[in-house]
Every structure is written in structure tokens, then in C-alpha cells.
Regions:
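C-terminal alpha-helical interaction appendages
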Residues: 1-117
Length: 117
């Protein structure tokens, strides 16, 4: 199944739009930028992962939304406990990292992954 944007989930607090395609693409491009692998390899890694599986409800979306795309990318490539292998647990320069995410999203016309309404 192809992941797509515009998935709407409702719960008692309101609704969330999960742009799953954009989220997956952002993680792929972070793998390319931060790890230095090809887009093809990054795509295979992401598409085999839980990031690309169908999401059932708002609760699952909420769980995803607590993970930084950086964290998802590093976890997928380096595995659990990647921070024990000398990989920073989170971006060392958060401003630079946010600028990188923004640049990727603009360049590839990606949507904000999570929109709570």
C-alpha cells in the first residue's frame, strides 16, 4: 500500500491530520542528509519500517508525533540504543536541524506531518 497525506483521525480531544507520506519522505531525506546513503536505500529502509504501515487511530498518530523525525531516522539506520554507538541522541544543533527539516520540506513540497485541529 502507498502511504499518503491527509489521513484524518478523531478522538475526544478533537482531530489530527496525519500526513504520513510527508512524514516518511522527511525521514528518507534526513537519512540521505545525515547518514549519507542514497535516496533509494533510504526509501527501502523507511518502506520496510513501521513508519509506512497503516495507522489505526488517533492514539497511534499521537505516539508517532512524539518522536522527532531525526530519532526515527537514526533508529531505523543504526538500531536501538544508537546513542551508545556515538551517534548523538538528538541533533547537537537543534536550530540547524530544524532549518534542515524546513529546507527538505520546502524543496520536496512536503506537508507538516501532524496537524492538530
Amino acid at each position: 500500500t502507498m502511504v499518503r497525506d491527509g489521513l484524518v483521525f478523531k478522538d475526544e480531544d478533537g482531530q489530527v491530520i496525519f500526513n504520513q507520506y510527508s512524514f516518511c519522505e522527511l525521514v528518507k531525506h534526513l537519512l540521505v542528509e545525515l547518514v549519507g546513503i542514497s535516496y533509494e536505500e533510504a526509501s527501502q529502509i523507511v518502506e520496510r519500517s513501521s513508519l509506512a504501515t497503516p495507522v489505526a487511530d488517533a492514539m497511534e498518530v499521537a505516539i508517532f508525533s512524539h518522536e522527532l523525525p531525526y530519532y526515527c531516522a537514526m533508529l531505523l539506520y543504526y538500531g536501538n540504543g544508537y546513542w551508545q554507538k556515538g551517534i548523538p541522541a538528538q541533533p547537537e544543533d537543534m536550530d540547524a536541524h530544524e532549518a534542515l527539516e524546513k529546507k527538505i520540506m520546502e524543496k520536496y513540497d512536503l506537508k507538516e506531518p501532524f496537524i492538530w485541529t
